[in-house]
Amino acid sequence: MAMSQVVNTYPLSNYSFGTKEPKLEKDTSVADRLARMKINYMKEGMRTSVEGILLVQEHNHPHILLLQIGNTFCKLPGGRLKPGENEADGLKRKLTSKLGGNSAALVPDWTVGECVATWWRPNFETMMYPYCPPHITKPKECKRLYIVHLSEKEYFAVPKNLKLLAVPLFELYDNVQRYGPVISTIPQQLSRFHFNMISS
């Protein structure tokens, strides 16, 4: 029987946080985003995106770092890959863009680990599925979620227009209404891992 993989999680207090220039969203509405996705699809084909699951611990319980836009919308750090870009390299590029400092010395040592989920967008709609429906031959997006193993201490630079929240797994679990289907199922995706809670 295979042993469950170990993920080291360090206290949130080990990490330091600063700010940097705002990271403006390319779209002002969901309709705008889907319209842009359609234009990009015509040019480049299926969109491939990657997102990072960054884990810390508080009170001996795993927490995930989420970016909050406005008062309610939360998302994992990540984004769209360039055509032909390697997924791990693309995720590191996106994480640095979202949370890296302004100098190379302030960029965390991103260690991209296991892919824990793959989601599919069959049409130019908001719904995504953890499988590609059988009648869909040309899905519009494939999104992969990766664990990103953090070092014991890091510095994160958060764009001024965003908040970085540490959200416990118990709050995410089954909370589709607040976090959507992708983020709210992360606790199930992570259940095969053993969390090594390292105190400071």
Swiss-Prot record:
Give the SUPFAM superfamilies listed for this entry.
Nudix
> Cellular component per GO?
cytosol; mRNA cleavage factor complex
Physiological role: Component of the cleavage factor Im (CFIm) complex that plays a key role in pre-mRNA 3'-processing. Involved in association with CPSF6 or CPSF7 in pre-MRNA 3'-end poly(A) site cleavage and poly(A) addition. NUDT21/CPSF5 binds to cleavage and polyadenylation RNA substrates. The homodimer mediates simultaneous sequence-specific recognition of two 5'-UGUA-3' elements within the pre-mRNA. Binds to, but does not hydrolyze mono- and di-adenosine nucleotides. May have a role in mRNA export.
Q: Belongs to which family? A: Belongs to the Nudix hydrolase family. CPSF5 subfamily.
A single Gene Ontology molecular function, please? mRNA binding
| Originating organism | Arabidopsis thaliana (Mouse-ear cress)
Recorded hits in Pfam families, A to Z, give: NUDIX_2
The processes (GO biological process) annotated in the record are: mRNA 3'-end processing; rRNA processing
Statement: the UniProt record of this protein carries the keyword Isomerase: no
The record describes its quaternary structure and partners as: Homodimer. Component of the cleavage factor Im (CFIm) complex. Forms a complex with cleavage and polyadenylation specificity factor (CPSF) subunits FIPS5, PAPS4 and CPSF30.
Gene3D superfamilies named in the record: Nucleoside Triphosphate Pyrophosphohydrolase
- Gene that encodes it: CFIS2
Give the matching CDD domains: NUDIX_Cfim25_Nudt21
- Where, per UniProt, does this protein localize? Nucleus
Q: Which residues form the Nudix hydrolase domain?
A: 45-172
Alphabetical UniProt keywords: Metal-binding, mRNA processing, Nucleus, RNA-binding
Q: Where is this region: Interaction with RNA?
A: 72-74
Q: Where is this motif: Nudix box?
A: 79-100
Instruction: Specify the protein name.
Output: Pre-mRNA cleavage factor Im 25 kDa subunit 2
- Residues at site: Interaction with RNA? 33, 179
